[in-house]
Amino acid sequence: MGKNWLTCVSVACLSPGKDKKNQKPEKPKRKWSFGKQKSRESFDFPLEETPPVDPSPSSVHRPYPPPPPLPDFAPQPLLPPPSPPPPPPAYTINTRIYGESKESKNRQALALASAVAAEAAVVAAHAAAEVIRLTTPSTPQIEESKEETAAIKIQNAYRCYTARRTLRALRGMARLKSLLQGKYVKRQMNAMLSSMQTLTRLQTQIQERRNRLSAENKTRHRLIQQKGHQKENHQNLVTAGNFDSSNKSKEQIVARSVNRKEASVRRERALAYAYSHQQTWRNSSKLPHQTLMDTNTTDWGWSWLERWMASRPWDAESIDDQVSVKSSLKRENSIKSSPARSKTQKSASQSSIQWPVNNDTKSRKIEVTNRRHSIGGGSSENAKDDESVGSSSSRRNSLDNTQTVKSKVSVETTSNVSNAQTVKPKANVGAKRNLDNTKTLKSKSSVGTTGNLANTEAVKSKVNVGTTSMPKKEVVADKKKPPQMVLPKKRLSSSTSLGKTKKLSDSDKATTGVANGEKKRRNGGSS
């Protein structure tokens, strides 16, 4: 049996096809194939006769028992035995025409050896499968089959799931490609790319600016620290006295240091002198608070500066002369401005020249100056000391006081002139109006103002009564007082108002008498 099966395999491998057999011998191809077929067929017959090439079943296959019948669930063999082909017809080949070559023999031998080896491998595989099937028991085969079927089902389900997922992914990719290929998507993508470019450009600019600002801040802080260290070093050198950073020369620096030393010495001397004078004032017989609280004295409420200025009458007289000159110039200007004013001023000047100076004002002025000299020191030595002590601040205060006095004198002169002009037409009207004016002047004179004095002076000049020079002389006497008496004047107004009102009342009586006499004359003339 094995011999017949091997011959069938060799014939199937080496024999030509049926179409080659049915071909006509006229064509050259058929001649070529026919020659090959003859050579092959001529080579087959002696192989069957030679014993080494023809394999016997005893040498190749071992005798095995027939296999038992397979159950229904057993797997079928992988390679079923091929059906033996029909035996080829016998051909008589003339071996003499076609010579056999050694190469063809070697090829045939190799082909037969390979075929035998393949057959042996197939038989060995079948035998191994049969041995395994026979040796394994029947029960575990059933359990393994269930597990295998379950694994197969699981694998099939998982493969289906993966296939569906891959299909879904492929469909999504196809849709995405179709969308990307559209015009709207292209425009959108271009716009997005341009905006992304601008955003990246802005971000880079902002980052560069931040880096630049941080670097500038670092350099600024470094410079500030360096300047601070330089200032500290400079201050240390200056405090130690080893360095002077000014751009001045050596002589200028030395002169500045000398001036500073002299100024410090002067300051110390002034402080020491002021302290010593404070002690002398405190140790005086009359305490300063007693003089301030004493209302009988004319220097009530003076400060030490006013007392010091009162002890310098020569300065006060020079200031009063300047004030009188300025007031006279202002009066001349006012006289030139209006003819009515010029007439009143001429009459007032004539009356003032004819009227003698009152001795009471002179005595009062002498008493006031004596008192001031007694309070301020009363001697020329104290005055000299005060001159040495007087600083720039005291001189400035004295100048300010003189300016205030000048302004007050100018205001008084202008008010006197204006009041004189207003009273003049009123005196020409009649006696009744003169009486009314005198009544108003009496009521105002109780207050002790300067306006009443001016009104009475104007009325007296109109009636040709020689009483107009007295108040003007009093004003001139008041002008000659020192400029530091501005504050005491306000406080002394209440004490001196009584004397002034008495004088005003006498002058008013005279004016009223003159007015009554004129009225009687008019009445007599009319009758």
Swiss-Prot record:
Residues 335-360, 399-422, 437-455 have a biased composition (Polar residues). GO terms for cellular component: nucleolus; nucleus. Residues 256-273 are annotated as: Calmodulin-binding. Residues 63-90 have a biased composition (Pro residues). It is found in: Nucleus; Nucleus, Nucleolus. Residues 147-175 form the IQ domain. A motif (Nuclear localization signal) lies at residues 478-485. GO terms for molecular function: calmodulin binding. Signal peptide: none annotated. Residues 17-26, 361-370, 471-481 have a biased composition (Basic and acidic residues). Binds to multiple calmodulin (CaM) in the presence of Ca(2+) and CaM-like proteins. Belongs to the IQD family. May be involved in cooperative interactions with calmodulins or calmodulin-like proteins. Recruits calmodulin proteins to microtubules, thus being a potential scaffold in cellular signaling and trafficking. May associate with nucleic acids and regulate gene expression at the transcriptional or post-transcriptional level. This is Protein IQ-DOMAIN 4. The gene is IQD4.
